[in-house]
Amino acid sequence: MGERTPMLKMVGVSKSFPGVKALDNVSLMAYGGEVTALMGENGAGKSTLMKILSGVYKKDEGKIFIEGREVEVKGIKSAEEAGITIIHQELSVLNNLTVSENIFLGNEKHSKFTGRINKKLLDERSKMFLEQIGCDIDPNRLVSTLNVGEKQMIEIAKALTKNARIIIMDEPTTALTDVETENLFKVIENLRKKGIAIIYISHRMEEIFKICHRVEVLRDGKYTGSAEIKDIDNDKLIAMMVGRTIEDQFPYRDVKKGDLALEVKNLSCKEGVKGASFTLRKGEILGIAGLMGSGRTELAKTIFGEYKKTSGEISLNGSLININCISDAINNGICYLSEDRKKEGCILGMSVGENMTLCNLKKYENKFKSLDKKEEAKDIEYYIKKINIKTPNKEQFIKNLSGGNQQKVILAKWLMLSPEVLIIDEPTRGIDVGAKKEIYELLNELKASGKAIIMISSDLPEVLGISDRIMVMSEGRISGELNRDEANQESIMKLAVGINN
C-alpha cells in the first residue's frame, strides 16, 4: 500500500515581524478524515502559522500543498477558494441577523427575476447544511437568541457552504458547557467522516486524547515533531512542547523573606476567577504561570480593583482591606503593570516625564494648587538615572522609546508611589534580550528592598528563572503551587492543563 497523500502539507514556512522571527522553517501535515492537534506553549507560533494558512498573514518563505498540489494563499478569499476555513476562538457571527443570513453572509442567493435576496432558498440551503452536521436550528431564528455552542454550529455550517476541505478550530471549547462540548465532538466526527481535515488547537489534554488522531508540535517558532496519538501519553506530549533547559540568563537573587505582605482568601470575580487563595511575603517574587485564558490577568485585576470581586477577602500586612476600585488599591499600596503597556500602561501622546508622574500629581501641588515643576523634574530625573531609562530627555514622547524603556517608565510611575505590593503582568513581552535582563535586575533590587512582587508570565523559563515560588492557574482556579527547587517546565505544564498528579 502506497504512502498516503496528506490533505494539507506546509513545508519550510518562515515568518518574521520587526525584531522577532515568529516562525522558522516550520512544517505541518494534516490528513483528510482525521483530526490533527496543533500543540505548543503560548508564543510557540501556532496562531501565526494558522493565520498564514488562512490568509491573514503572508509567509516570508515556504510552500503550501493541498492534496499534493501547490497553492499560493494570498489572502483570506484565496484561502477560502482553496478550501481552507478557520473558526476563531472569538466567533464572528452577527447577532442582529438570522441563522441563514449569517451562514450565507457575503454569499447570498439572489432571485433571477427581482435581484433581491431569495430568503426561501437561503433558509432551505441553511437547513441542509445544518442537517449535515446533525444540527436542528431554525434558519429563521435571530442569532442573538442562540447560545455559544449553537453559534459555533453556525460558523461550521458557514464553512461547509464554502466547500471547506480543511477546517481550523482555535480553542473551540473555551466558552462551551460540557453538553455543548460533547455536541461539538459529534459534529467534528461527522465532518471527519465526510473526509474533511480538522486542525484542532487546544490546551486541554483530555480533548486531544479523546478526539485527535495525530499531533503536530511547535516550540519557539520551530517544528519539533509529530506523533500518532495512540503512540504517546501526557508526559511525552508535554516533553515535546517544552523540551528545553533554562539557560543561565536569569539573574536570580536569593534574599531573606520578610513578614506576610498580602493574603488573598477565596477570591472570585465574574470575569473568571474562582475561589483563589494564596499568600505573598515581603522580599518575595511569586510567579504566576498558566495558559491563555487561565485567569491570571483577571486575578491581578481583581486584586487591583479593576474587576469587582464577587467573593473573598484581601489582607495587607495582616489587616483586612476593602478594594472596590483602582484608587482603593493604589491608596493601599497595591500597583499593577498591565500586560498591554501601550493601551493600559502609558499614554503614548504624552512625554516620558508626564507619564511618570501621572498617578502622583498631588505630591507636586503647591499652596496655589499649581504644580511645582522643579520638584517634579527632580523626581523624574532621579528615576531616569536610577533605572537607566534611555531617553534623550524627559520631554521625549514615550511612544518614541523602545519597549524596554517604555516598561521602565511605567515601572517608575508606580515606584514613585512607594507601593507595598507590585503586580507585573508579562514584564518582558516585546522586549529585547538586553532589556529583559535589566528588568530582571530591577525586580531583584525591588525584592531585596522588601517589596512583595507578583509576576505573571507566559514565558516558562522566565517564571522558573526569577521566581521564589510558582503558582499555576487553570480555568480560573489555582491548580497548584511549586517551590523554586521542585519546579520545572513539565511540572508547571501539567498543572496548567489541569493534571494535578
From Swiss-Prot:
<comment type="function">
    <text>Part of the ABC transporter complex RbsABC involved in ribose import. Responsible for energy coupling to the transport system.</text>
</comment>
<keyword id="KW-0067">ATP-binding</keyword>
<feature type="binding site">
    <location>
        <begin position="40"/>
        <end position="47"/>
    </location>
    <ligand>
        <name>ATP</name>
    </ligand>
</feature>
<keyword id="KW-1003">Cell membrane</keyword>
<keyword id="KW-0677">Repeat</keyword>
<keyword id="KW-0813">Transport</keyword>
<comment type="subunit">
    <text>The complex is composed of an ATP-binding protein (RbsA), two transmembrane proteins (RbsC) and a solute-binding protein (RbsB).</text>
</comment>
<dbReference type="InterPro" id="IPR027417">
    <property type="entry name" value="P-loop_NTPase"/>
</dbReference>
<dbReference type="GO" id="GO:0016887">
    <property type="term" value="F:ATP hydrolysis activity"/>
</dbReference>
<keyword id="KW-1278">Translocase</keyword>
<protein>
    <recommendedName>
        <fullName>Ribose import ATP-binding protein RbsA</fullName>
        <ecNumber>7.5.2.7</ecNumber>
    </recommendedName>
</protein>
<dbReference type="Pfam" id="PF00005">
    <property type="entry name" value="ABC_tran"/>
</dbReference>
<dbReference type="InterPro" id="IPR050107">
    <property type="entry name" value="ABC_carbohydrate_import_ATPase"/>
</dbReference>
<dbReference type="GO" id="GO:0005524">
    <property type="term" value="F:ATP binding"/>
</dbReference>
<dbReference type="InterPro" id="IPR017871">
    <property type="entry name" value="ABC_transporter-like_CS"/>
</dbReference>
<keyword id="KW-0547">Nucleotide-binding</keyword>
<comment type="similarity">
    <text>Belongs to the ABC transporter superfamily. Ribose importer (TC 3.A.1.2.1) family.</text>
</comment>
<feature type="domain" description="ABC transporter 1">
    <location>
        <begin position="8"/>
        <end position="245"/>
    </location>
</feature>
<dbReference type="GO" id="GO:0015611">
    <property type="term" value="F:ABC-type D-ribose transporter activity"/>
</dbReference>
<dbReference type="InterPro" id="IPR003593">
    <property type="entry name" value="AAA+_ATPase"/>
</dbReference>
<keyword id="KW-0762">Sugar transport</keyword>
<keyword id="KW-0472">Membrane</keyword>
<feature type="domain" description="ABC transporter 2">
    <location>
        <begin position="255"/>
        <end position="500"/>
    </location>
</feature>
<dbReference type="GO" id="GO:0005886">
    <property type="term" value="C:plasma membrane"/>
</dbReference>
<dbReference type="InterPro" id="IPR003439">
    <property type="entry name" value="ABC_transporter-like_ATP-bd"/>
</dbReference>
